[in-house]
């Protein structure tokens, strides 16, 4: 098991980041890879959780220990796997998640991808009163305007990797057309829109 990996961020994709340390590049699946956009070729510390399956050894990465703690709580719920837990964390509304669990708000919880009514009920049953979280906001980064909105395309690709359907993403993309922001901010805004 690894608690964290400290090294140079060398690559960002829609599903994962690569952190190189001691000549080894570790693939870390993270909730929002583009949150690391401004840190390419810089030293980063990513908190990790390793999942060993019959067909794969996977590392999941988190920006903070709090994010990792939420992930571990979520995957302890029957019916929630690592991919779904990452999608929930990607919304970046920890207070809203806690509030929904404490208030038994099934409607809010079922807005997450792959969370149905039964899984939402199980989340409430297993997690009610278990954790208190506070929102942690990252720095806002602006990008230079361009004719092609690559950041929006990257954001939509990352959202699809989190399990959102193309039909949902088409509406979101249309809403953001003509705007200019970072992929990270597009993802945060889109996730908040989908949770309404």
Curated annotation (Swiss-Prot):
Recorded hits in Pfam families, A to Z, give: HHH_5, RuvA_C, RuvA_N
Family statement: Belongs to the RuvA family.
HAMAP family, alphabetically?
DNA_HJ_migration_RuvA
Q: Which biological process terms from the Gene Ontology are attached to this UniProt entry?
A: DNA recombination; DNA repair
InterPro entries named among the record's database cross-references: DNA_helicase_Holl-junc_RuvA_I, Hlx-hairpin-Hlx_DNA-bd_motif, NA-bd_OB-fold, RuvA, RuvA_2-like, RuvA_C, RuvA_C_sf
Specify where the region named Flexible linker lies, as residue ranges.
142-146
Main role? The RuvA-RuvB-RuvC complex processes Holliday junction (HJ) DNA during genetic recombination and DNA repair, while the RuvA-RuvB complex plays an important role in the rescue of blocked DNA replication forks via replication fork reversal (RFR). RuvA specifically binds to HJ cruciform DNA, conferring on it an open structure. The RuvB hexamer acts as an ATP-dependent pump, pulling dsDNA into and through the RuvAB complex. HJ branch migration allows RuvC to scan DNA until it finds its consensus sequence, where it cleaves and resolves the cruciform DNA.
Give this protein's Gene Ontology molecular function annotations.
ATP binding; four-way junction DNA binding; four-way junction helicase activity
Q: Which NCBIfam families match?
A: ruvA
Q: Cellular component per GO?
A: cytoplasm; Holliday junction helicase complex; Holliday junction resolvase complex
| Residue span of region Domain I | 1-63
| Annotated region (Domain II), positions in chain | 64-142
**In its UniProt entry, what is this protein called?**
Holliday junction branch migration complex subunit RuvA
**Keyword Ligase on this protein?**
no
Location of region: Domain III:
147-196
What residue ranges are annotated as transmembrane?
A: none
Q: Which organism is it from?
A: Streptococcus suis (strain 05ZYH33)
Q: What is the lineage of its organism?
A: Bacteria, Bacillati, Bacillota, Bacilli, Lactobacillales
**Domain notes for this protein:** Has three domains with a flexible linker between the domains II and III and assumes an 'L' shape. Domain III is highly mobile and contacts RuvB.
Q: Outline the subunit composition.
A: Homotetramer. Forms an RuvA(8)-RuvB(12)-Holliday junction (HJ) complex. HJ DNA is sandwiched between 2 RuvA tetramers; dsDNA enters through RuvA and exits via RuvB. An RuvB hexamer assembles on each DNA strand where it exits the tetramer. Each RuvB hexamer is contacted by two RuvA subunits (via domain III) on 2 adjacent RuvB subunits; this complex drives branch migration. In the full resolvosome a probable DNA-RuvA(4)-RuvB(12)-RuvC(2) complex forms which resolves the HJ.
Q: Where in the cell is it found?
A: Cytoplasm
Q: Which UniProt keywords apply?
A: Cytoplasm, DNA damage, DNA recombination, DNA repair, DNA-binding
Q: Which gene encodes it?
A: ruvA
